[in-house]
């Protein structure tokens, strides 16, 4: 399993001024890839917005793309000629020698995007990234993403759904610690995002707003093909929570509980299994009048 010394926060202040909650190294990109595999196994549908990527001719942005694993899998599933763009603040994650229809660029969601990108994407996709806004106003980051969508195009946002999780005592402790961590580093902006985002999308004038909630099984509740990956993913995330909270003010979970959490978490999820939820939220920019 992962070693605690390999997962560290790169933030210099503890308030996520650099838009990174956990580390920026191979361990972290591996964790992100495992997270993708767990979510995709439970929910193999890439796009909920009514876009048929198999028709081709679309331009898609995946912001906070990490290794580009979502792009690679969505591109393969589409099986047609589209244009794919992945952005992240950690360029070392990007794949080498991507196909001609795929490009990767450095870009922070808290900074201005290239002016020439505005209004050019049929789909802007962001997954498990918005808590990384830190103390930058969440609404500003979301407005910048919306500005990239072309008239008639779509934005799709995927984040944690913090309620109605089916976990044991250690799982409940882990969930509380993670929520406290995200709350601390984002000034309260990075949790309960569905409730925050829907009014923002409406205020921005977007239409056809809809969402769905997906349940992802872990450990003993997961299928044999993905079980080991779900366990490793949770362990790596728990290590990240345990290590990153060392540089933050105290949270509602004690230091002793945080230090013991990864190993206890692994034992519980192997024996009993857990279920966590995330939401997929999509909305359309109206056609120009």
Which ranges hold each PLM region?
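C-terminal lobe and adjacent flexible extensions of AdoMet/dcAdoMet transferase-like proteins
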Residues: 204-207, 214-289
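Class I SAM-dependent methyltransferase Rossmann-like catalytic core
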Residues: 2-57
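A short SAM/SAH-binding and catalytic strip from SAM-dependent methyltransferases
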Residues: 121-139
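A short glycine-rich, Lys/Arg-flanked "PGG" loop and its adjoining helix->strand segment in the class I
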Residues: 139-154
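Helix-to-beta-strand junctions that scaffold the AdoMet/dcAdoMet cofactor pocket
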Residues: 79, 133-134, 149-151
